[in-house]
From Swiss-Prot:
Keywords: Ribonucleoprotein, Ribosomal protein. This is Small ribosomal subunit protein uS2. Gene3D superfamilies: Glucose-6-phosphate isomerase like protein, domain 1, Helix hairpin bin. InterPro entries: Ribosomal_uS2 (IPR001865), Ribosomal_uS2_bac/mit/plastid (IPR005706), Ribosomal_uS2_CS (IPR018130), Ribosomal_uS2_flav_dom_sf (IPR023591). GO terms for biological process: translation. Residues 235-244 have a biased composition (Basic and acidic residues). GO terms for molecular function: structural constituent of ribosome. Belongs to the universal ribosomal protein uS2 family. One of its GO terms (cellular component) is cytosolic small ribosomal subunit. It comes from the Bacteria. Residues 227-258 are annotated as: Disordered.
Length: 258
């Protein structure tokens, strides 16, 4: 059974690409048709590519690899944070800081500064400093937390990047490619798929589409960590309901519509 069904993808609007005048010809193989000046993505390809990406992420996490979720566009920010935290990984959802991968040592010094400021606030140091100085330190802490909060506990350079809209996250893509870090990404019709190791063709502008795909990548991480099939609680309850109904009315195959 595929990770995502055609019905789920359609309902989330994953099939809507960009306007035909804003496209990358390299995405032609992932385009099904054109409708009213909009490219329609071939969801059969998306289903297949999603399965491949899911298996890759799951297998890599089973080996202890870490993943950095990246999505700084408004439609992705909340989802990137929520799903990365849900699966216990790391994220960048505000702005990609130049050198985050290629100059990680310098980034680590900023993270240490953030942790230092957090300790000062917690241990009461702020209480004995002049109010003006404390205000400046708090502003510094909030700024560092905004941009580095999602990676403050990341122990090393990530092994994999998951990206929403590699065209927007161009600097992240370039740094990852320079270091040979594999990239999994939602790739819309205006992106270059050649730069991505695991292409997931889909709409990177719709919040529901981004949420659907990103949540499945997070599920792959959780399954990789647990070594077993992950199912949200709602799905587990549904499975129990299905079994109960089948036991009572096993002659009626149409009671539950999967």
């Amino acid at each position: 059974m595929p990770v995502l069904t055609m019905k789920q993808l359609l309902e989330a609007g994953v099939h809507f690409g960009h306007q035909t005048r804003r496209w990358n010809p390299k995405m032609a193989e992932y385009i099904f048709t054109e409708r009213n000046g909009i490219y329609i993505i071939d969801l059969q390809k998306t289903v297949k590519k999603m399965d491949e990406a899911y298996e890759f992420v799951k297998s890599q996490v089973q080996e202890g690899k870490i993943i950095l979720f990246v999505g700084t566009k408004k439609q992705a920010q909340e989802t990137i944070k929520e799903e990365a935290e849900r699966c216990g990984m790391y994220y960048i959802n505000q702005r990609w800081l130049g050198g985050l991968l290629t100059n990680f040592r310098t980034i680590k010094t900023r993270i240490e500064r953030l942790k230092e400021l957090q300790r000062m606030e917690e241990d009461g140091t702020f209480d004995v400093l002049p109010k003006k100085e404390v205000n400046l330190l708090r502003k510094e802490k909030e700024r560092l937390l905004k941009y580095l909060g999602g990676i403050q506990n990341m122990p090393r350079i990530p092994d994999i990047l998951y990206i929403v809209d590699p065209r927007k996250e161009r600097n992240a893509v370039l740094e990852a490619r320079k270091l040979g870090i594999p990239i999994v990404a939602i790739v819309d019709t205006n992106c270059d798929p050649d730069e991505i190791d695991y292409v997931i063709p889909g709409n990177d502008d719709a919040i529901r589409a981004v949420k659907l795909i990103t949540s499945k990548i997070a599920d792959a991480v959780i399954e990789g960590k647990e070594g077993e099939q992950f199912a949200p609680a709602s799905e587990q309850k549904e499975e129990v309901k299905t079994q109960e109904v089948q036991e009572v009315e096993d002659s009626n195959d149409d009671v539950i519509d999967d």
